[in-house]
Amino acid sequence: MDYENKILQKYNLCNRCYGRIYAKLMRMGNKDRGTSIKTVIAMNFEEKLKDLIEEKNNLIDIISNSQDINENEEIDENTKNNEDTENKADDKSQSNEEKIQEIDEKINIIKENLTLLRKTGLNGIKNEYIIEELLKDDITREENESEENESNIFLTPEQKCPWCKDVFNIQNLEEIADKIVEALSEYEFDRFLIGTRLPKRIKELEKDLETTFNEKNTESLRNEFGRELGKILTKKLEKPVDKETPDIVVMVNPYNQKIYLQINPIFIKGRYRKTKRGIPQSHWDCRSCRGKGCEKCNFTGKQYPTSVEEIIAEPVMNIAKGSGEALHAAGREDIDVKMLGKGRPFVIEVKEPKVRKMDLLKIMDEINKIEGVEVSDLEYGVKNDVRFFKNEPHTKTYCALVSIVDEELENHDFENDKIVELSEKLENLRIDQRTPHRVSHRRADLVRVRNIYKAWCEPIDEKSFKLTVYCDGGLYIKELISGDEGRTKPSISEILDIPCYCKLLTVMEVHDENNPANY
């Protein structure tokens, strides 16, 4: 505890801020805690002061009595005027005066500390224990030239406090709260959280308290300010503070009343089916103009007229009125690939929505009116759903139409028996697949291990067959078939010893806990 007032000597902290230094001790408000601690310190100083004053008075009495005795004492002619006795008395008197001087120095130090406590907001200290001159602010001649600084004499301890600068003043809190209510009026939300931005000098002060003075029980002003402002806003907004999942985080600088809104996104999850080829999963900028708009893209800035993302997001954004959106899916299919079965799991993230509560069934109906994409199982999700879809391994079932390169038919024996045998050879087969050439511009050049668990091959004619595989997600099926110039090993072309390619590909199922594989 700061019984020597070292902290107050460096920082003239008000009662609230002084209590915040010891915020982790005792369950009470910082202002009450600070007042209580200062009171105990003041009582300790006053007790020492009383003892010193009493000791000083006793010494004064001793000196006074000694002087009276010396004046009335008869000189003994037979003892050479008793010079030795007088010298001893003078020495003793001088010693007592030195002690009084030392006591006065101690008394002055204690009074300086008591004056400092009064100056920083502690009432109840006796006036005789205060050094009046120290109560006045030491304003230099240059400072006096400024009207603003001349008024410093009339500032409260809180306004003078270098830590809080009186930001906890109820008027300041109410003004900030009213600004926040106005800023939030255009947003729909159920829960909120207050965040506090501190100026650099305040952060440095807090760090100094922790390092220089080794105070480990300190609470940052940002925590207390957020707590106090949150109480006022809870009543004004009639909505609760939520530290875990707030819809909106209100960032406040309490020193200049600036407000910043962090509107957290909403997440809507479901599954989509792509029943038409030629639709990419996400928006593609025009290759010629890079999204700026040109004759080739009919000034749309898009390489393709639409995408799965745009079809799903448009009706959502029309209602939510967000600033942007992003589609997160469990993998992706190529533009020329269908996505059938129960559909691919996805999450649509709406950034900074003004409306959070929507009729998802109605939105689902709107999406399903558009040819080529269907959605199902729409419901509200959370941010963790995005991580799950991105990181959780999914197994998948594909169906491919495999064709043999025409010019190679004459040079290779293609028999139906080989196709039937291929099913057995592919089952439980490990595939080492280096990043395909066609995606090497956007994916790291690595060798990835994937597994085929089950395969079914069915001949169609003398140069094509149907291939169905149940395998790990992330296995490039087109390259599994072609071999990609040896980058995928083994490949179907290698096993059959005849060059093959994928003519058509369809994702039949994306398997997860809600859609397990039953093979």
Curated annotation (Swiss-Prot):
Entry's EC annotation: 5.4.99.25
GO annotation, biological process: tRNA pseudouridine synthesis
Pfam family, one: Pus10_C
Domain THUMP per the UniProt entry, residue ranges: 144-265
Amino-acid positions noted as binding substrate in the UniProt annotation, renumbered to this chain: 398, 476
Keywords, sorted A to Z: Isomerase, RNA-binding, tRNA processing
Active-site residues per Swiss-Prot or TrEMBL entry: 334
Listed Basic and acidic residues bias regions: 77-98
Catalytic activity as recorded in UniProt: uridine(54) in tRNA = pseudouridine(54) in tRNA; uridine(55) in tRNA = pseudouridine(55) in tRNA
Disulfide topology: none
InterPro entries recorded: PsdUridine_synth_cat_dom_sf, Pus10, Pus10-like, Pus10-like_C, Pus10_THUMP_arc, THUMP_dom
Region (Disordered): 70-98
GO molecular function: tRNA binding; tRNA pseudouridine(55) synthase activity
Function: Responsible for synthesis of pseudouridine from uracil-54 and uracil-55 in the psi GC loop of transfer RNAs.
Similarity comment: Belongs to the pseudouridine synthase Pus10 family.
Protein name: tRNA pseudouridine synthase Pus10
